[in-house]
Amino acid sequence: DSINAIDWNLKHVNAGQTDYYKELIRLRKGHPAFRMTTAEQVARHLKFDKTLPGLISYSLIDNANGDEWKEIKLVFNGSGKPQEVRIPRGEWKVIAEDGRIKADGLGSSKGGKIIVPATSALILAKEK
């Protein structure tokens, strides 16, 4: 019937978004840092950064919840313009940037000043 019908064309129209969500789920399932269950764990491993309006930036530190990654840096730019953030120097694996995500990594970064595009997320992981 027309009320409960599935528009199968939307599967193809939204394939990119669906793939992005699948990678987010894969990232969460593959890393215990994203599955902390107690307030104590969160208090011990979650550190927020001071940011400009429109930005949220935080780190999951010290191999949170037994994760293989020593630190995970997450930056969300909810503003309508690109924003510059400072990432601590080091060897970072780029997990998500500019509307792309890959749980195994998109590339690498040395940290420093990074531009986060408008309405996007940046996820970095430090293994050591």
Predicted regions and their residues:
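Solvent-exposed beta-hairpin/edge-strand motifs
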Residues: 89-101
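A broadly tuned, weak detector of single residues within folded domains
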Residues: 17, 93-96, 112
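Conserved active-site loop/cleft motifs that coordinate metal ions or position small ligands
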Residues: 74-76, 94-95, 123-125
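C-terminal beta-strand-rich structural cap/linker in extracellular carbohydrate-active enzymes
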Residues: 106-128
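Acidic Ser/Thr/Pro-rich low-complexity disordered segments
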Residues: 34-37, 101-106
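Loop/helix patches that line or flank the sugar-binding groove of alpha-linked glycan CAZymes
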Residues: 1-91
